[in-house]
């Protein structure tokens, strides 16, 4: 049997995504074992994922990582399920020279530490909104300008700064940019200032509740750019439930969706993954479950390519892996970040999120420019 440790947020503030990640790992474990296990030297070995709860607390994540390595003797790790916990768990894995494939870290600040043993299957934060810009620039009429509002937390600022840099490199004129305190209830002043600059595209980089307030207040103020785009919100049931018809034509991003049609070199496609997952757990997978399954598959393939569970050999196999999965391409740069993977662009159309970019995975065409509040 091959034992692999996993650090997940099963309780606390990040429990919802952590529980989905747990199911994603268990699906992968069961799928691998059903096909005969992990193949080493011609023989199949059952996979057992040894899960520890970090309670959504970074300090606990470090302690759980230490426990999995020193007490449970796990020499290969999965997780953690978010950036904050990974930031504390990764140095522990690095100290013990234990490979860690995380399903939840995408902050460039983490990967810029150039850890030797950390690998992440998510596309980095810096690329989160690049697809929205690429999509918009492919439309007619082609946008010329944008404005951006961003929450003051470090992750939102990271995404916003990267988005501005990418937009400028693509020739867009950034006519307005401002930061607001995370959790603020009134964005009308900033929205008015942004609208006054006359942007074709208006980006909001924050959290789901702030995205909802942006739509509500933009509608009240009759602010109508050609596109409203968000780092978080569109694509979730809560967003469309809160906004109803007003949610239509808003654009957001996701690391994965059940309708994603990726070319696969290993494992099943998104459609069959979603069906099998729903049969096993009684509900559809989300991007957090899918990322966990992808992380687990990546580690399995690395073990088989190394033909060993020795930490150093598996680490070396991870560093050169190139895998086309239902989740997207998995290929790590010299930081351990998965820069090969696209972030998918979704748009709410007729009350439901649909994939609109990249073209090779899209299930619908972008609705651009936004037809206006009266036509929602």
Where in the sequence are the language-model features?
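Extracytoplasmic ligand/sensor domains, especially the bilobed periplasmic-binding protein
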Residues: 23, 71-177, 226-252
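Extracytoplasmic "Venus flytrap"
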Residues: 1-28, 52-58, 81-82, 149-157, ...
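Hydrophobic alpha-helical segments within soluble ligand-binding/sensing domains
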Residues: 61, 120-145, 185-188, 211, ...
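Segments of small-molecule ligand-sensing domains
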Residues: 276-289, 298-357
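Beta-alpha junction/loop-to-helix N-cap segments that form part of ligand/metal-binding clefts
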Residues: 3, 16-23, 38-112, 121, ...
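Short, polar/charged alpha-helical segment
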Residues: 17-40, 161-168
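Extracellular/periplasmic periplasmic-binding protein-like sensory domains
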Residues: 215-293, 309, 353, 359-375
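Hydrophobic alpha-helical
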Residues: 83-94, 192, 199-221, 295-298
């Amino acid at each position: 049997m091959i034992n692999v440790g996993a650090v997940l947020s099963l309780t606390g503030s990040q429990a919802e995504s952590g529980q989905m990640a747990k199911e994603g790992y268990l699906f992968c474990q069961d799928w691998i074992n059903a096909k005969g296990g992990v193949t080493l030297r011609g023989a199949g070995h059952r996979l057992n994922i040894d899960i520890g709860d970090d309670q959504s607390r970074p300090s606990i994540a470090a302690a759980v990582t230490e426990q999995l390595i020193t007490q449970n003797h796990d020499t290969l790790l999965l997780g953690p399920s978010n950036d904050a916990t990974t930031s504390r768990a990764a140095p522990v894995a690095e100290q013990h020279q234990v490979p860690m494939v995380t399903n939840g870290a995408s902050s460039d600040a983490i990967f810029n530490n150039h850890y030797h043993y950390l690998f992440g299957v998510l596309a980095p934060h810096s690329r989160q909104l690049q697809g929205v810009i690429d999509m918009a620039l492919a439309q007619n009429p082609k946008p010329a300008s944008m404005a951006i509002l961003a929450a003051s937390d470090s992750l939102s600022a990271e995404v916003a700064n990267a988005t501005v840099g990418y937009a400028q490199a693509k020739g867009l004129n950034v006519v307005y940019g401002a930061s607001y305190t995370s959790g603020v209830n009134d964005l009308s002043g900033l929205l008015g200032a942004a609208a006054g600059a006359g942007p074709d595209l208006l980006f909001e980089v924050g959290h789901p509740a702030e995205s909802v307030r942006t739509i509500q207040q933009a509608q009240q103020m009759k602010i109508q750019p050609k596109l409203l785009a968000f780092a978080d919100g569109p694509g979730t049931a809560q967003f469309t439930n809160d906004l109803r018809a007003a949610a239509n034509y808003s654009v957001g991003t996701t690391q994965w969706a059940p309708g994603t049609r990726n070319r696969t070199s290993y494992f099943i496609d998104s459609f069959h993954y979603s069906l099998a997952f729903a049969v096993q757990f009684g509900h559809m997978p989300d991007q957090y479950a899918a990322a966990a399954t992808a992380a687990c598959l990546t580690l399995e393939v690395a073990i088989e390519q190394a033909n060993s569970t020795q930490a150093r050999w598996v680490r070396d196999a991870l560093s050169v892996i190139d895998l086309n999965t239902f989740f997207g391409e998995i290929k790590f740069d010299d930081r351990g970040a998965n820069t090969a993977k696209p972030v998918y662009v979704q748009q709410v159309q007729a009350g439901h999120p649909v994939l609109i970019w990249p073209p090779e995975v899209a299930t619908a065409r972008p609705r651009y420019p936004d037809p206006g509040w009266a036509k929602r």
